[in-house]
Amino acid sequence: MKEGIHPMYNEVTVKCACGNSFLTRSTRKEIFTEICSACHPFFTGKQKLVDTAGRVERFKKRYGQA
């Protein structure tokens, strides 16, 4: 690699709006995010399934998944 043309790749702290923070590496000095794995509904288990017109129940009934 050529000397002096690549950006500095440092260890930085990623800060989330929920207050969680973790370390990673980046060319930026600091990173702010609105949602992370600590507060995202998919990772916290608080994800809600939106059922439009009973399609999920119809699928479960049709294919025998209870």
Swiss-Prot record:
Question: What is one Pfam family matched by this protein?
Answer: Ribosomal_L31
Q: Which terms does the UniProt entry file under GO BP?
A: translation
Any one Gene Ontology molecular-function term assigned to this protein's record = rRNA binding
Q: Which PROSITE patterns match?
A: RIBOSOMAL_L31
Q: Per the similarity annotation, which family is this?
A: Belongs to the bacterial ribosomal protein bL31 family. Type A subfamily.
HAMAP family with a match to the protein in the record: Ribosomal_bL31_1
Instruction: Fill in the subunit field for this protein.
Output: Part of the 50S ribosomal subunit.
This chain's function reads:
Binds the 23S rRNA.
Which NCBIfam families does UniProt cross-reference here? L31 (TIGR00105), PRK00019.1 (NF000612), PRK00528.1 (NF001809)
Q: What is this protein called?
A: Large ribosomal subunit protein bL31
- Organism from which the protein derives: Trichlorobacter lovleyi (strain ATCC BAA-1151 / DSM 17278 / SZ) (Geobacter lovleyi)
